[in-house]
Design a protein with these regions (language model features):
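Conserved N-terminal subdomain of the carbohydrate kinase-like
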Residues: 41-134, 329-341
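Alpha-helix C-terminal capping segments
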Residues: 22, 29-42, 63, 292-295
């Protein structure tokens, strides 16, 4: 877990003097859809003993209806451990968002499997699903091993595993071969595998369409071919998903998704969504998809809920969706933005 500092009113970071701070992580952002809709969610993470930022993060997770578990490390002095900071503005109009990560001394790099009683979590507590992000898997050699061991233990207990590849070039630099092996094994163990066109190419070596660009709706066949290759490479995985995004302007995107399960394909054709802050939209999609899977909905319904949950997250300043209820999410899918009284 870390924090995000965001300038108010859509201003650039470098010329702002007023900021909002929020607690954030890819995994907790995904879990927020389920926690706000009443499912129990626990976050496994690390804290800094006595840190007011750790207290801020714990209080935020509690406000999201989540529990948490993890070791508390001594800071080790003023140059020691702390929580990472994302310096991220929202962009506005024709000026795109910019993100800089300050990860010096990040306590999350210290995570190890033996800091948790995984048999209790997956056995006695009966966790049905564990979601892993490639951000943590690539953070350090220790966290790579942590994610591997968590996935292996979950598989041994019959717990479903979700893995969002979340490639970040800065974390992979100099560790490409090592991380490719780690990500391959986690993907092999996973029941749900998520990534965009760049993630699948850079993390797993599977060819796909060129990243980004215009005309995303006309590239759907290329995305399906890419997912087809991923399915061949990972035959034990049950669900494969990718999002489709074309940026018209900072505040207007074409947003779509593709989900494949078994022989079935569920394509949410890109359509316009309004965007207040784009960061967390992909996590919102995954969170909505997993909520539908946990509710044992038909896959088409779960995929639609994922699309709408991602669109919801894009309307919020937080990195995560905070649905009031299922009806609010479905109204987004249906394109109904009328006032509800």
């Amino acid at each position: 877990m870390g924090t995000r500092l965001t300038p108010v009113n859509g201003q650039p970071f470098h010329c702002s003097d007023t900021f909002k701070m929020q607690a954030t992580s890819a995994e907790s952002n995904v879990g927020a859809v389920s926690s706000y809709l009443g499912l129990p969610v626990k976050v496994l993470t690390a804290f800094v003993k006595g840190s007011p930022v750790s207290r801020f993060i714990k209080d935020n997770l509690a406000s999201r209806h989540m529990t948490f578990e993890g070791p508390e490390f001594d800071a080790g002095g003023p140059w020691g451990l702390r929580h990472q900071i994302n310096l991220a503005d929202s962009g506005a109009g024709s000026r795109g968002p910019r993100v800089a990560n300050d990860r010096a001394g990040e306590v999350g790099r210290m995570l190890a499997a033996d800091q948790f009683d995984l048999d209790r979590i997956f056995g006695e507590e009966g966790a049905q699903f564990i979601h892993l992000s490639g951000l943590i898997a690539a953070l350090s050699p220790e966290t790579s091993q942590f994610c591997l061991e968590v996935a292996r233990k979950a598989k041994a207990h019959g717990t479903c595993i979700g893995f969002d590849l979340n490639h970040r070039a800065s974390l992979w630099e100099g560790r490409e071969e090592e991380l490719r092996q780690v990500f391959h094994e986690i993907a092999t163990l996973s029941d749900v595998l998520v990534g965009n066109e760049e993630d699948f190419q850079l993390c797993l070596g599977i060819d796909g369409p060129p990243p980004g660009g215009e005309g995303i709706a006309g590239k759907i066949d290329g995305f399906k071919e890419m997912i087809g290759r991923v399915k061949q490479a990972y035959p034990s995985t049950s669900v494969f998903a990718t999002t489709l995004r074309e940026v018209v302007s900072v505040n207007l995107h074409q947003w779509g998704a593709i989900v494949s399960a078994g022989d079935d394909w569920h394509v949410m054709e890109p359509r316009e969504i309004g965007v207040l802050d784009r960061i967390g939209g992909g996590d919102g999609f995954v969170g909505g998809l997993l909520y539908g899977i946990l509710r044992e909905w038909p896959m088409e319904k779960a995929a639609q809920f994922g699309w709408a949950s991602g669109a919801l997250a894009a309307t919020l300043l937080t990195d995560y969706g905070q649905p009031a209820d299922e009806d609010q999410v479905w109204s987004i899918w249906e394109g109904n933005a009328r006032v509800k009284r």
